[in-house]
Amino acid sequence: DNTRITAKWIESELGEENIGYRSRVTFIGDKGKDYRIIEVESPGESLAEEVLLVVSNFSSPDSSPGANYNASSVSMFLGLARYFVNTKNARTIRFVACPSRFPDPDSGSILSTSYIAEKCKREKEKLVGVVEIGSLGFFSEEPNSQSFPNNFDIDFPTTANFIALIGSQSSHQSMNSFISGFTKSSNIPVQKVSLNDEEISAFDGLSVFTEKGYPVIRVSDTG
């Protein structure tokens, strides 16, 4: 189906004949080889055992065409992978592309990010941070173009001309580092959203990492 086709395309784009990485593929799902998680790395040097994880999911819900959901995430993901290929960095940067969920015979479906977080914890990897790339395709200077669910007490601007960083309170330092670097090269405003444990639980893709003790932030257009 389209999810498998997309996974193969991303694997090809990241590969040695295109961007230049050697891809590592994990097959997941109740039939063994139904869904793919694609990983590539830019190896670190002095602190190579410390890993910054950059995650994008490439599947869309049935109610949302891909261009309206995560096509922008995949585009940013590939752009970052291309930027960092063959660069020298103290820490290892690992790029992971995955479907949002994959089928499980016991629970019905499992979040791919949950699988990734469990694997990192099991293998005792030293994740210094996780960046989850959300949708980034919307930008507007129109008044009242930004809204947010009423059950969150977040004071967002009403004009959707900014990048949102959403994370747990334990990700405070990671978000500040991101903002410091981003604002040196871009004039786009950045809104920092620090959520408590109860609020972060509403964001499945984030909470699976915070529950394992990993600092995580989501980069998004409107949150």
What does each of the following model-derived ranges do?
Residues E11, G15-G20, A81-N89, R101, ...:
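Sec-exported extracytoplasmic/periplasmic mature domains
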Residues N2-R4, Y21-G29, N89-I93, I188-E199:
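Surface-exposed patches in mature extracellular/periplasmic domains of secreted proteins
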